Regions:
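N-terminal, positively charged, Ser/Thr/Ala/Gly-biased leader segments
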Residues: 1-22, 118, 130, 135-136, ...
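Short, charged/polar, Gly/Pro-enriched secondary-structure boundary elements
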Residues: 124-128
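A glycine-rich beta-to-alpha transition motif near the start of alpha/beta enzyme domains, typified by
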Residues: 1-112, 163-277
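Glycine-centered secondary-structure boundary/capping sites
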Residues: 86, 129-131, 143, 235-236
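Membrane helix-loop-helix hairpins that form the core translocation module of multi-pass transporters
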Residues: 115-117, 121-123
Length: 277
């Protein structure tokens, strides 16, 4: 099977063109291929497929084989793949995901996509839609117990369920210990992606990410979007900010007039290969 390794701000996935390739068991393939010692290495597997309702369909599997609704970094890479590899000549695309149809605008220079802007949709703050095991209109600035310590957290769905909390120094955290405890907390029936956020100033956030099903990643597009949405709603930053991640920087903007979030960032090829499953 032919595949392509791509990354967006260091959030790397294995991409398969399912117009020409077939993956019989994507979940098992994701587990095997994502292994950084015995496989290709990546945060998961992305299948680029035909769609009856959009230009293309993106199917995502986390490194543990579980399905994912949406990934902001991966969808930018899909946009670059289909344009640079000649599957389309459009610079405005629609991509079907489990979180709905997303619109992409491709920034092309010298025949290749450099950056991609994505409409991430509206932030969903209702607990039952995130989902969070709590009543009320929102789940913002609420205390939860994690490994015997009280954390103040806020939740939102920006394509995936997210939990946002604020820290002074994200890099000082014991991620292998607290990451799984947050992800699998009883408040999150579908598990959650966790963003540990430092507010640098009104237009700059620094974020460290623990992703559901993949562990710590260098970047998360839906997570960066969630961090901006929660932080702006709480009045801790403006409606537009650069989100600095371990693997790079994403620009997130919230158009309150239409209640739509936009993410802009890079996408890059790493290498092509062939593997026997």
């Amino acid at each position: 099977m032919k595949f392509t390794k791509m990354q967006g701000c260091g959030n790397d996935y294995i991409y398969v063109n399912c117009f020409t390739e077939t993956v019989a068991d994507p979940s098992a393939a994701a587990i095997r291929l994502s292994d950084r010692h015995f496989g290709v290495g990546g945060d998961g597997l992305v299948l680029i497929c035909p769609s009856n309702v959009a230009d293309f369909c993106m199917e995502m599997y986390n490194a543990d084989g579980s399905r994912s609704e949406m990934c902001g970094n991966a969808i930018r890479c899909v946009g670059k793949y289909v344009y640079d590899r000649g599957l389309t000549d459009k610079t405005e695309l629609t991509i079907e995901t489990r979180a709905g149809i997303k619109t992409l605008w491709l920034n092309v220079a010298d025949g290749a996509v450099e950056t991609v802007r994505v409409c991430m949709g509206s932030p969903e703050f209702r607990p039952e839609k995130i989902p969070v095991a709590a009543a009320g209109e929102t789940f913002l600035e609420q205390p939860i117990d994690v490994l015997g310590e009280t954390w103040i957290v806020s939740s939102v769905n920006t394509g995936n369920p997210h939990c946002v909390t604020y820290v002074d120094d994200a890099m000082a955290l014991d991620f292998p210990r607290i990451g799984p405890a947050f992800e699998n907390h009883k408040m999150f029936p579908a598990r959650a992606n966790i963003e540990f956020v430092e507010v640098v100033d009104d237009h700059t956030l620094r974020v460290r990410v623990w992703e559901r099903g993949s562990g710590e990643t260098l970047a998360c597009g839906t997570g960066s979007t969630a961090a901006l949405a929660v932080t702006a709603r709480l009045g801790k930053c403006g409606d537009e900010a650069d989100v600095i991640l371990r693997g790079g920087t994403l620009h997130i903007a919230w158009d309150r007039t239409q209640d739509l979030l936009y993410m802009t960032g890079p996408a890059a090829f790493v290498f092509d290969g062939t593997v026997t499953l």
